[in-house]
Amino acid sequence: MNKKVISISNLLRKRILLIYCLFVSAAFLLICSKSSPLYPMNDWVDVHCFLTLGNGILHGKVPYVDLYEQKGPVLYFIYAIVALFNQKSFWGQYLLEVITFGLFLYYSAKIAQLYLGKSLYVYPIVAVLAGVIGTTKAFAHGGSVEQMCLFLFAYGLYCVLRACHEERSLTFRETLINGIFAGMAFWIKYTMTGFYLGMALFVLVWYLGWLRDWKKLLKTIGYFLLGFCAVTTVVFLYFLINGAVKELFTCYFYNNIFLYPSTDETPLLELVQLRFKAAMDYNEMFPTLIYLGVAYLLVQAKEKPRDLIAFFLCFAGLVIGTYVGQGYVYYGLVLSAFSVFGLVGLATLLRLIRLPEIPQLAKLGVRIIRISLIVTVCLWTLADAYDKSDNTYLMNYDKQDMPQYQFAQRINQVENPTILNFGFLDGGFYYASGTVPNCPFFCTFNVDAPGMWETQYQYIEDGKVDFVITRHYPLEMYHLNHSKYELVQSASMPFEGIDFTYFLYQLKE
């Protein structure tokens, strides 16, 4: 029994940094993310699109065939698991965010340790990093794909930097996992694979320029592709079994590339530059940390030139991949994966401050003071996050105040109700009412998908759903025959700084 207790104690001691990062993640997301149990619900339309798809899979729906959406299938497989724990609350979503953000903080801390060693500075770095990212504009409502995938990039950076510092090639395990992560990124949101293109270019330069070992390079490429293909095989098998490979390529690739509305004739590279600059200007703190990180790596370039090259290539790849398509505010969050280098630079400056020699007994007091200061920094950062987060206003509302739950009370008076979220992205009404869409275009998307409007119009004109929900514009303002429906309820709620009115229409008896 004692041996088992000692073994558990040793395991906890070894994993103290990971446990700390998960704790910090849970604490900051409790405040900064609307998926937190402190909020009535996460009312972000993107999150609800993912949840509706995940819940649809649990009910036998096939993405892109039975339910249309724009992101990649791996995201929906993940959200099918989330939906199992998300039936009555957002605990499943919150847990997903805590784990993925906690892993990001952990691998960011491991990057910091490459430069600072086992320094106590790593602990406040984690807290400050969580506070900076959690309160940035790009964090949005919490629960974005970009937020969920931050740990993929942090792990990739950690692997290549650690291998460089140890003067060795990437191990089989490191390469395979990065290949799996690249496959996940590709089948979640393929623009994020720009990071891995940058990493691949760095590995090529590193193996041929420094290691001078093309055999290891070929092995590394093979292991990486093995991981990537493992994820891709699972995706293909699922859609092959369901006879939906064509729909997968049409919806996920063709529609996203060619059907997004654009009237901008600016050259593509200039457009990427403009979007990147806008993201760095709009978000305040993490771009500053990135600039500081670049300055730090430039100072270190003589001793660690590969670190700067790895940073630049991975960062450039991610920027180009992210902004070659669109430039929504939350897209910039992926760049915060590089923020830790700025905090490492600041910690390095602080370590240059030398205290005078003090007696051994006094050293214990100094250590206690340092730990107290670290705890103070962590608590102050948490309090500051509450003050700066754009989301905390929603804590003042109860579930009953939300239009989603108000409408759900009426919707659930009908046996096996069907609803259509019309004219805007998924507002959370499927989630609140516990319904699964019967219309493939269960909401109105930003991409002008073929048949989207026609299908939704047909469902309304033919009375194929029990309820229709619109936002801002009543059904009467659309050019369609809505005579089979009557307005039964309306409710208002602020969303992203705008007071929206929602309208609930019910099929006439």
What residues fall within each predicted segment?
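Transmembrane-helix signature of polytopic, membrane-embedded enzymes
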Residues: 108-133, 150, 167, 173, ...
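Specific aromatic-rich, kink-prone transmembrane helix
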Residues: 148-167, 174-177, 182, 203, ...
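Short periplasmic/luminal acceptor-recognition loop of GT-C membrane glycosyltransferases, typified by
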Residues: 387-388, 393-448, 456-477, 495-497
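Hydrophobic/aromatic-rich transmembrane helices and adjacent perimembrane loops
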Residues: 194, 318-320, 324-362
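Hydrophobic, aromatic-rich transmembrane alpha-helices
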Residues: 106, 281-318
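Membrane-interface alpha helices of multi-pass inner-membrane proteins
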Residues: 172-192, 196-202, 230, 315-323
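Transmembrane-helix motifs of polytopic, lipid-linked glycan transferases
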Residues: 95-117, 155, 159
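Short acidic/glycine- and proline-prone juxtamembrane loop motifs at membrane-interface regions
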Residues: 138-148
